């Protein structure tokens, strides 16, 4: 109460911050007449002037006002669009490294140009992050007109580019791309062996579009580069046959936590089935050697009980394709990890693909926190403001709309069953369609969108076939005639190719669009339809300019007329009076786009995103959610109380309860889920930070090694540290000479360093100390390496040392990642022993890291002491086969996006007959099998001789 009163008197913190920008907005506006008088060349020259001012010591803040004014003028001349005052405020928020929350249709894409241009003047590169390739291409092509006019270059990073194209795009002043592409490029760069092969040039400033989707929905899901393991398809198919043999009493399903566990009876049954199939090792299912089997049994159970076809995934062309729960889009190429995707393939009886091993990974949380400055834009971030500040130190600033929002958000209607709910939705669609009001129906899954589509078909509606040319002609013709066309479009993962087109035309009179959640986000729905989209579609192939101009005028007239029809599609409703009260009241509900939600999402933000599609730039609109007690949110989070309430109210079949209390109760349930998900993300981040700290050390060290012309000093330090550890192990400090393990030391020197030294003789010398012993061994090892340098020359040796060091580091780092994953999976059990799992994880991860570094010293020293160089020419080190993938934001399971990367061409050398090989000339050997005898005549296998480091 007191807080509300204070806000009334003094305004909220957000209001005060927005007011604080007004002086600079006024200053920018004051420059407008002056800049309007400049010629194009004079306006373009301002970029060089700004750069000169920065070089003289001015800051970006010092030149913000003239720079923003310059961008506004350039936009007017190139795009015909002028930044509103509120858009200038949005640009300042972005420049300050915060989140600008702007409603749909307020021009976020144009707002970004202000902060992008200003920060690009620093010459360090600005990254604009979008959610898909289509938006990256669209926004870059559109906004590059402003940047190009002002003398700045623009690049685009999308799937399918090679490294040379990526490097050029990153070298531009401004780079547009998707969050996945930026993250994968960072991981791939840190697997390269030469600096010149790296494509990114640093992380200075990023503006993230749809920031809530990327930094929250996908926050806990890592980007992963992986390599394939052995094929085990028969094993998965065998395991899959066991699940149908189980009864529901054999396992417990927890939908809230998305887990399934075997009961005691289920374990016994599975044990018997495994034993009969010859898959059980030892006596019990829970013997150590069966850990992997138990894991895959659980994954098969999850595949059958928690994952539903056409909701979580679809089967297309013999492949299981994941569906993104937030957008309803297909994610071709992405795969669940830990054997879950293989379990789904076995369940659906399609070809089981091999599993993968993690080679490198990073979460978006840790990737985006690397930027010196990070900012974001979205229409819905206020509900997650605490999390965005807590994790990313980003404040959410709500930017006022240019025109007041005129959308009517109605109370939810709650029905007992889904059948009743769908009947009510159908009736509402028919009423809206009769007055030509366009309707967008949001669904939570493909399955639900197709149930609704089936309902519409049963009642005489026809689905638009977007595969045919001019698919919307009938809809346009009906709108011109002022009659309902009874046509509908479905936008889900099955029809994602036409996504932008379907969404853009969802504002045509009489249009009915069924969309899975926020599919099509990033494309505005304009009342009357999209001028750009229709011109693109309807003038394609017209070469005569006069004919083309006439067609464009016809389209413009069409859209203006359609807009008027939609604005007038109001509904007049008479509200029945309560007994004994005044006569019935008449209410006029607005026209515009009508949003119908078919169920509530776990997150209020996703619901707000759906609502926000209507009411853009002051247009009228309305929204309403239709719910049932059988909906997932209601069923999992407390429908029992609502059910008993409806029973007490005597609610009949087909009747709904509509009351603000219901909305508040649902909002509280959503807040609980959001708080739980925030805690999960925060906890996961604490664990991921442990790996992230180690990742930064390794990646920074790799870059330093590549930058160094010679790593000889590093190699010598590693060799000396290893020898020191070896001597300390066998010759303990303060021990008597007779207590020394001389034989063990001599044996390890031979095994690791490949040198035989008279250590036993040295140990017998009078008064010899361990320091003297250490010094002699180091001297002999150094002389051995110096001889190799003398034999091959310093240039060759520098290359060999760097290559072996980087390759060994990468190999051990990959093994270390696997160890950390295994540790992470079991560390939670420490909580039962009253120990903090996070502290235990930190401690053990550090111990593993130290062990890896010690192993690195030994492995690099051993390889360099034994290496023999065969080829005369320099060869690139060969990277393992790699695939890029990312994890599902809803379930927390890894989805793997197979983007096969071949960074080094494979050798095409052919085998050469033994008699044609010269033992002293490796260039005559051709391709030698690893297990063949080495052609040099040593008697060793090739892999243990010249083939070891060739």
From Swiss-Prot:
Subcellular location(s) of the protein: Cell inner membrane; Cytoplasm
> One Pfam family from the UniProt entry?
SecA_DEAD
Q: How is the cofactor bound?
A: May bind 1 zinc ion per subunit.
Tell me which GO cellular component terms the UniProt record holds: cell envelope Sec protein transport complex; cytosol; plasma membrane
Region ranges (Disordered) = 908-932
Q: How would you describe this protein's topology in the membrane?
A: Peripheral membrane protein
Q: Where on this chain does ATP bind?
A: 87, 105-109, 524
| UniProt GO MF annotations | ATP binding; metal ion binding; protein-exporting ATPase activity
Residues that hold Zn(2+) according to the record: 934, 936, 945-946
Cofactor(s) for this protein? Answer: Zn(2+)
Gene Ontology biological process: intracellular protein transmembrane transport; protein import; protein targeting; protein transport by the Sec complex
NCBIfam families registered for this protein in UniProt: PRK12904.1, secA
Protein's name according to its UniProt entry? Protein translocase subunit SecA
Question: Organism source for this protein?
Answer: Bradyrhizobium sp. (strain BTAi1 / ATCC BAA-1182)
Taxonomically, what lineage is the organism?
A: Bacteria, Pseudomonadati, Pseudomonadota, Alphaproteobacteria, Hyphomicrobiales
Encoding gene, per UniProt annotation: secA
